[in-house]
Every structure is written in structure tokens, then in C-alpha cells.
Amino acid sequence: MSTKITLDPVTRIEGHLKVSLDVEGSTVTRAYSSGTSFRGFEPMLSGRDARDAAQIVMRMCGACHVAHGRTGLEALESIAGATIPNQARLLRNIIQAANFIESHLLHFYAMGLPDFVSELPTVGSMTVTDSLLAVGREGSLDESVLRDHAAQAISIRRACYELIALLGGKIPHPSGLILGGTTVFVTKDLFDSVQKLCETITGFTSSIPEGDVELLATAYPTYESLGETGCGHLAHGCFPDRAGNPMMKKGFLAADSATVASWDDVEITESTASSKLAGPSPLAPFSGVTEPDLSKSSAYTFAKAPRLAGKPFEVGALSRALVNGSTPAHRGVWARYRARAAEARLLSAAIATWLTELEIDVMSAPEEAVTLGSGQGFARGEAPRGALGHWVVLEEGRDRALSNHLTDDVERFSSR
């Protein structure tokens, strides 16, 4: 006998998600993930001055706002042929890295850990949370260590927020990211404050998150293979050096290959066959349509279905790790958490290095205003949760009907 289970809304995410499962016995026979909200950022931008875009697209997400802002700016800068000052590149890298670290700590300690421990500590206004413990615990687990670290992680996340606010103007949605550079003027006092925050963050991320993941992996060994998708892994690359080469490389690792390959953007398409969206399907991003159509009988979600060469793909910290040479025995739950924890450590060290390259009392804004005319451009980027892209067409400095955004969540919650 088949049973239908519906979770609506799914909590501990940033968005509107419903999951429906058809279950026979103990086996899930069919599953649907539904984006239940029409976001409409593309039509919202149509006809607007393109310089508004970066601040607007940051509102797509409260967790990966920096990545959307930066990628949106880079798409516009590609149209203008603008090269940002080195000081601005360093500051964008530092701001985005701090956003990655905060998001990884949020994901593990606030969104994931409650499933694996009996309760979390009371910290300030945060109340004790009872947990429905995940199935599969086979080993002993010292929960007190994890509870202590979860409390410390809140302070470290705050340090990340403070760092972003100091260099980006505010948090979330930093206003200091502008076309052609950033607005911050790094004084000696500002530098000293940021460096102190970096030391605080590094003191935690250098070993604690990775150790905590291993504690859980020992207690819940079956989660090593749980969640393996069999899909390929895509990474867009991020944190460029002065020559434009990304610290985290870009590439695609097919499911049946051990070799990282390049790909052509023409291979990326988005289908709306199962989406409550109008237009022919599938379409390349530069031809994309984002208009609601509630009359489609087969539609069950507002999410599109992105494909690379016609196949679904996975994105995120694990994908970045695989593309950059990691070879885990399994690609399940713990591989994903290990990848996030390792990134938190690596990016903390990277921030310390970028700080040594910053110049004191040097402008990070462009010497001359960047002028936007007509043309089309795109940029690919990485958010903490995975790869994203912005494709833009301008007419006389304004967004034309097309301003298409491929987000990491759309890739993760792809429709059929």
C-alpha cells in the first residue's frame, strides 16, 4: 500500500520548499521537491538602470547575498570591459570568504547538528532545542563537546558578520560592493580591527569544525554513503588572484569520470516542462523566460530544471572539493560536511594572506565611473551552497527583458 508524506514547509532552509514522497513499505518510490514561491527577480529588473541590479539581486538570498552581488557586478563589468582595482579584488575576496565561513558554520552547527544531538545550549535569547535524533547512531558520542562548539560557533559567526560589515558597509546585503570596485577606504585602524577578527575566526576554524564532523561520522557511519546522487559535479571557480585565476578552480567532473573537464556555456539549458513558468523549453540562459503560468496541469513547482549537456548535476562545497582534486571514498552526508569544514579552514587562512596584500589608505573604487551602454554579458560565481550564474542583456544601460539568474538552490531543487 502506497503512502504519501508531505513536508510543507521544509524548515532550516532559506526559502519556500515543499517535499512530497510516495512510500511503499520502507521504500520511497517517487519524490517531488517544489519551490512554492514565484520570486520574479528577472521581471523585477526589466527596464531598470543596471547599476541597481547588484543591490537587488543580493535579496535573492540572505545566506549567499555576497555571491549574487559580486556575480551580478562581474556580469555588468564584462559588458563594460571594466577591470577593477587590485584593492577591490582583495576586498571582494575577503568579504566573500567571510560569507562562506559564516554560512558553513550556520549550515553545520545550526541546521545540521540538531538532528544528531539531544539538545543544544541556551545562548542569550536562543532557547534549548529538543531534537528528533537521526536514525543510525551506532557509536558513542560525547554530545557535550558538540554543544560547547555550537555555542562558540555563534560568536565566530558574529565575527564573520562584523568583518563583512566593516569592509562591506552592512550585513546582510553589503552596500559597499559597487560597479567597478568597492567603496571601502582601508585605514590602519580598520585594518587592525579586521585582522583581529580574522585571528578570532581562524582560532576556531583551524581544526574544530573538521574534528566535530569526524565525531559525528564515527557515531553515524551509515551516513558516509547516504545521499550519494550519482550525478556529475560542477564548480564555477572563485576567489581570483591578480591574474584572474581562481583559487578554487572551475571544472566539471562527470559521474563516470575521474578527469575534470571544461565545459561550454552553450551546454547549459533550463527546462520549464514541470515548472509553473511560461515559454518554450529547454532554453539557454541568454534566451531564458521567467514568467508565471499557473495553467499548466503538469507543473508542480516554480523552480526550473537546469541541465549540463542534458544531464542534472550537483553543486556545492563537495563539488568544489572534487573538482579541485579531493578523492573521498564516498560522496554522501559526511563528505559534504567535511568539504564545508575544510573550506572554512582554508578560507580563514586565505583571508589572512589577502590582508597582507591590502594597502593602507588606498582607494578601492574605480578612478573613473564605469559607463554601461548596450550589450550582453555574463559571469559565473560560487555561493557557499554552490555554483551560480548571471546572464544580462542591456539596452542603453538598462536591463532589457532578459536578466537571467541561475542559482545554487535551483540546481539543488531542480524540477523534472
Segments from the language model and where they lie:
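His/acidic/aromatic-lined binding-pocket segments of jelly-roll/cupin-type domains
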Residues: V392
